[in-house]
C-alpha cells in the first residue's frame, strides 16, 4: 500500500479546523449594498433569496427563517399536531430534530439507523409506527440522502407527513432529485459550518401552497396585512443581511460541494487501506455533499476513538464526534422517561464515529498529512 511519509511540506505541523466558513469579497460587497440601502429587514433580498433557493432545489415555495431549528419548528406547527401525537425521528442526529417535536407537545419516537450510512433505518421506522404516529422526520445525515423511497412508502401506507431535515444536505440528491423536495416539507439550516452559510439562517421548502401560506403567516406574527393578524404567530424572519450573504453563497454551492466530493474521494483512497478504519459508505442513489466526512474507528484499529482524536488534535488536525450519544440518552431526555429506549446500531456508532476535515479549504497536502497521522498507528 502507499505510505504517506512525513517529509517536506507534509512533515510540517498544520492547523486544520474541522470546519471553515468561506466568505470573501462578494459577500462583503453584498453586505455593503444592504447597509447602504438602509433596508435591513423585509426588503428585496429575502424575497430574491427565497426565489433563488426554490429554483435551485426545484420547489414552488421557499420560506426564509432565522435558523434551521425554527424551520423544523414552523414545519411541525403547520401540521397542527395535538398533544400525544407521535413523530418518528432518528436516534442519531443533532438534538434539534427531536426537540422541535417536543415544542409541539407531541412525542418523538426514536428509530435506529443503518450501520453503513448512519441514516434512519426504514425497517425500524416501520416497526415504530402506531395509531398515534402523524409524521416522520428523516435526517439526510452528513450530506447523504436517507432512503426516501422506502420512507415515503411507509408514510403513504399510514397517511403520515414527511418532513425532511435537510440541515446538512444542501445540494444533495436522491436519484437526481434534490433533498428538500422529496417529502411534504424540507427544512434547511445555514449555520456557519454548513456547506453554505448566512451565519445563522434557515429555509423551509414545499410544493404545498396551503402549508406554505400557513408557514409564512406563522413566521410574521400571523399578519395578513399591516396590523391585521389572523392567527397567533411569531417573529422568525430572516434579515436582509443574511439573505444577501445567502444569495452569494448559493451561487458557489455546487462548486464547493464538488470540492468536498473530491476531497472525500482522496480521503477514501487512503482510509480504505488502513486496517481498522472504515470510510463513509455512499448509496448508489445518492449524490453526497459531505457536510461531514465521518469514519468508523473499529475495534482492530490500534487506538480507541478518543485516543485517536487526541492524537490528531496534537498534530493540528481538527476532529469532531457527530454524535457522542443517542438523543434519548441526553440528560434532558432521560428525565422524560426515554432511558429505556434501545437503538443498538446508534449506540455502537456513537462510540466509533469520528469526523475528519473535508471542507473546500482542505488541499492535497492536508490530506496527505491526515493520512500520515492515521497511518502512523496502523500496522497496514
PLM regions: where:
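Structural detector of well-ordered beta-strand residues that form the stable sheet scaffold
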Residues: 63, 88, 109, 162-163, ...
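Conserved active-site segment immediately N-terminal to the catalytic lysine
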Residues: 164-197, 225-230
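PLP-dependent aminotransferase class I/II
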Residues: 7-11, 47-51, 59-62, 123, ...
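Phosphate-binding glycine-rich loop
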Residues: 39-86, 100-104, 110-112, 177
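Short beta-strand-to-turn element immediately C-terminal to the catalytic PLP-Schiff-base lysine
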Residues: 189, 202-207, 247
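N-terminal "arm"/small-domain region of PLP-dependent enzymes with the aminotransferase-like
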Residues: 2-39, 44, 315, 357
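PLP-dependent aminotransferase-like
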Residues: 77-166, 173
